[in-house]
């Protein structure tokens, strides 16, 4: 007998989306924040991360249930003279903001350290700033099929651990 290659939506059980910030950033999904350099993408997302680390409401009053850890992975700025001062200025609890040390091997989107760290830290938000810096060497950002493949692993991680993945892309 031939294996069935389709399914009807009537057999699917619907589920509710859980939100970090409704209707902008869902848990278990990827969110992409895109813009030109200098438009405030990092400032904006660090403010959101800071609120999450302290369990504070989002800018429009959307309630967060409690404080959660965050992973902020930035390939362009120094942790001590740029990133931590920005986190402090945003009001983050820096004991709840982690980053993956990539001294021996550059971190890429297909690196198992991402999933391991998200699980170990218990992060509800993973921020990769900017996307281009975490592409695998053969990652062609102009190929839709290649980008789907690369981001697919990150989407699976976000869904499996019910975290939100926020990705920055420079125009």
Question: What feature does the model see in each segment?
Answer:
Residues 30:
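Walker A (P-loop) ATP-phosphate-binding motif of ABC ATPase nucleotide-binding domains
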Residues 73, 127-128, 162-170:
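Structural recognition of the conserved hydrophobic beta-strand(s) that form the central parallel beta-sheet
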Residues 1-4:
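Charged, amphipathic alpha-helical linker segments immediately N-terminal to NTP-binding catalytic cores
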Residues 53:
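Gly/Ala-rich phosphate-binding loop of Rossmann-like dinucleotide-binding domains
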Residues 6-9, 15-16, 20-22, 26, ...:
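Conserved inter-motif catalytic segment of the P-loop NTP-binding fold
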Residues 44, 48:
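Hydrophobic positions on the alpha1 helix immediately C-terminal to the Walker A/P-loop
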Residues 159:
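Helix-to-beta-strand junctions that scaffold the AdoMet/dcAdoMet cofactor pocket
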């Amino acid at each position: 007998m031939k294996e069935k290659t389709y399914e009807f939506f009537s057999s699917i059980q619907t589920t509710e989306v859980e939100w970090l910030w409704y209707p902008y950033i869902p848990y278990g999904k990827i969110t992409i924040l895109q813009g030109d350099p200098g438009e405030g993408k990092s400032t904006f997302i660090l403010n959101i991360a800071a609120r999450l680390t302290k369990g504070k409401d989002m800018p429009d009053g959307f309630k967060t249930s409690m404080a959660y850890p965050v992973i902020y992975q930035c390939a362009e700025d120094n942790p001590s003279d740029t990133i931590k001062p920005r986190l402090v200025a945003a009001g983050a609890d820096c004991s709840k903001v982690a980053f993956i040390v990539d001294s021996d091997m550059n971190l890429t989107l297909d690196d198992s350290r991402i999933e391991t760290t998200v699980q170990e830290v218990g992060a509800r938000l993973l921020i990769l700033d900017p996307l281009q810096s975490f592409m695998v060497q053969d990652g062609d950002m102009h190929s839709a099929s290649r980008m789907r493949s690369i981001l697919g692993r990150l989407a699976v991680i976000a869904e499996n651990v019910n975290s939100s993945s926020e990705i920055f892309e420079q125009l």
